[in-house]
Amino acid sequence: MTFPAFLSPDPTWDGDSTGGPLLLTVRFSASIPDFPLDIENPDITTAAGLKQLIRTHLPPNLSSHRLRLIYAGRGLEDATPLSVSLKLPPSPSRTPVVQEDATTVKGKGKAPIREQPRLYIHCSIGDIVLSDADLAAEAAIATTLQQEQADEGYTGRKKQQQPPPSTTSAPRGFDRLLSAGFTPSEVSALRSQFMAIQSVSRTPDTMPTGAELRELEDRWMDEGSSAMAAGVPGGGEGISFADDDGGFGAGSRGAMDDMLWGAVMGFFWPVGCAMWLRREEGVWSWRKGLAVFVGVVINVAFGAMRIMN
């Protein structure tokens, strides 16, 4: 089995720029056991290079399939170095701390050596088989050094041909996942689920669209669903799924208010609520509408009990 060329030390790369290898453990979605990988040059090795290395450990029938690398809930972009994608700390903190002197000053014995923990990378193996051209394109961006060499090759031609500046804005929201290997249909399905979550606690006229929707998607991808559930401390204008998912858990700050006011309105003002809902459809969220219905049922129950007694 041959290993990709980018794993061997490059004479043009300064080896002192990193403090040690990056220890990874690859976990597959298929029934393939985990295996460890040591990346010698994480500052120049990209996610595409990691895919090339993973392919050498896969069975022959899976080595050409499309791979997706996920770390901490985010897809790794092929052309980005691992040190940037994984948000690694500076190199001195990644290396094991080994003391030069075996004994401490006051005769306390040998100091323990802290081993560097391994990072877990989830690898999803798709059903699509990549062509030779796709595999060659993936290998071409295996390291940043190869990208720099390719850039130097056509720098002169770019100077001669001055194209007009592109007005296309950078992808925002879930469109950023397209560069990580997701298909347009998968991005569309994810956006549909996100809109369904938002529609639970929003009326049709307050649903986010355009730039506001992309901003919500960016915030969800950057901060993660756990951070969104925790809310934004110190401000009342932050958007979080805990406030807007329409749930009834302890994390929903507006759930109790909606249930209380909805039940009170349904109990004391059932006819007015019915006329209001008839004239302005979608004025309440699903949660408050359910609370109003509960209040009306309680009103009817109390009236029936009074008539029977």
Curated annotation (Swiss-Prot):
InterPro entries: Dsc3, Dsc3_C, Dsc3_ub-like_dom, Ubiquitin-like_domsf. Glycans are attached at N61. The chain crosses the membrane at residues 257-277, 289-309. GO terms for cellular component: Dsc E3 ubiquitin ligase complex; endoplasmic reticulum membrane. The keyword ATP-binding does not apply. Disruption phenotype: Impairs growth on solid media under hypoxia and leads to triazole susceptibility. Impairs virulence in a murine model of invasive pulmonary aspergillosis (IPA). Residues 88-110, 148-177 are annotated as: Disordered. Pathway: Protein modification; protein ubiquitination. It comes from the Eukaryota. Keywords: Endoplasmic reticulum, Glycoprotein, Membrane, Transmembrane, Transmembrane helix, Ubl conjugation pathway. Component of the DSC E3 ubiquitin ligase complex which is required for the srbA transcriptional activator proteolytic cleavage to release the soluble transcription factor from the membrane in low oxygen or sterol conditions. Required for growth during hypoxia and triazole drug susceptibility, as well as for virulence in a murine model of invasive pulmonary aspergillosis (IPA). PANTHER family: DSC E3 UBIQUITIN LIGASE COMPLEX SUBUNIT 3, TRANSMEMBRANE PROTEIN YOR223W. This is DSC E3 ubiquitin ligase complex subunit C. The gene is dscC.
